[in-house]
Amino acid sequence: MVRSDIRSYLTIAKRELCEAPTSWLAFSALLAWMFGLYWSDLFVFRLTTTSFEFLELRALWLAVEAVALLVLYFGLLRVLKHSSGVAVVAGTFLFVGSILVLFAPSGFAFDGMRIVGVVLTGLGGAALLALLGIRYARKGPKLLLVNVALALFVAALFDSILLYLPLDLQLMIVALLPVVCVALYVASARNNAVAEGLIDGSTSTEAVEVFTTNSTKINIIRIVALPLIVGLAYGLMQRLTSDAYTSGAAGVNTATIVSFFLSSVFIALAALFIDSRKLIKLVCFAAIPTVGIAFVMLPLFSDAREAAQAICIIGFNSFYFMVWALWAGDRAEPSLPKRFVLGLFVLVGAESLGSVLGVPVVAALDDSGSTLAVVSLVVVYLLLMAGIFSFDRSGTVDQEQQAVVGAELSGQIAMGDRDLDIWVQRYGLSARETEVFELLAKGRNRVFISKALFISDNTTRTHMKNIYRKLDVHSQ
């Protein structure tokens, strides 16, 4: 099964790389823009006003994004109906805001213009982030992580080239990245129009009601509790490593880019193991310790906070996008976009709040290594508990998803053999998998299928897992 999983994963990655590049390239452009404006020290001098420092303006940007996401949540139906138009408006906000931030003259008289630019980038960034995230979530957890990994890798590669360009060219490129992002998104929307049409309405109302009733508590954990903890810890990390941006160290940008590269590797591994319980081990024994080591060792990084920040970014990026994958795993389609935007609101809002709360924390530390270590241990403990509690209950939701999909497939196949042929052709099932698939849709269990088809239990299990993987339904 390991070889089969790897082959399936490589096939998916190759298909996304060759057949749907505009989708992840759009996100890559957005990530590269974020790095240029808010995640590097390239333009710190332009993101500083008389009254506000760089990190305070970045916290404002995150807060505006959170407010915009909350507004999107209540008007999401209209937004999705006119997604391309909304993307163009959001890209315009992002472009104009970037121009104001990067090219506004220095001085107190122009501080208001720069703050308006930050607000506009928050409004535009939130809309594009939500639209891209929802599109990936509709593809399922594995495809979401594959797209994110590709986008992170390309963004890191692009940013590494950006570092060596002249300052004026850097400013121009970063300002134009929102235009590139929107153009790629609109092109991707046209390419995916048919596919998204097939997805819309694919889950019956009864199935949605059963799903949302049985998994309310788990949804609260995944959409509210876990993003809240991750966001707060992320914002606090930014404050604790604030010296990385203000010390003028040449290595901060390189460290951030390397962390983006490594994050793409971690997320690609998560996509490989998303169908099994190994994902829990990957989160609990890779991402959490990575963040933990960075937090606990922060006192030792007093002269090299950029190194601690890079380690934290690797762990938190793994958390950040695995939380996205959890939301994508809840496949009750009518409520998926709203759940995603709500979770994103909590995540971004908590990150902004963590950055604000980090101000008194940093002031109280007063270079006290022991106090910093205590704060670090508390954060790591909360992340560990939240991660284990959330991921360890993923099996319950997966079983509910299989029941929902099974009920829906039963209704589809009951219409006739022609409908079965459509499902088989759409998902590329083999002849034996088709036989197993038909019995599964009729509600038969593994034992019955083994006896009916005269095959071993292990063979039946293998066929079932292959079917679940092709249909993007996750079985334990």
Regions found by a protein language model. Give the residues of each.
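Transmembrane alpha-helix termini and helix-breaking/packing motifs in multi-pass membrane transporters
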Residues: L72-L77, A155-I173, A268-L272, L353-S370
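Helix-turn-helix DNA-binding segment
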Residues: A407-K465, R469-K470
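Linker/hinge segments immediately adjacent to helix-turn-helix/homeobox DNA-binding domains
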Residues: R3-S4, A32, G36-R46, V67, ...
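Intracellular loop-helix junctions on the cytosolic face of multi-pass helical membrane proteins
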Residues: M1-A13, K142-L143, A156-L236, A271-K278
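Glycine-rich segments within core transmembrane alpha-helices of 12-TM secondary carriers
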Residues: G140-P166, F340-G358
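Hydrophobic core of transmembrane alpha-helices in multi-pass small-molecule transporters
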Residues: F110-L128, A304-Y320
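Intracellular juxtamembrane helix-capping segments at the cytosolic ends
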Residues: G125-K139, S318-E333
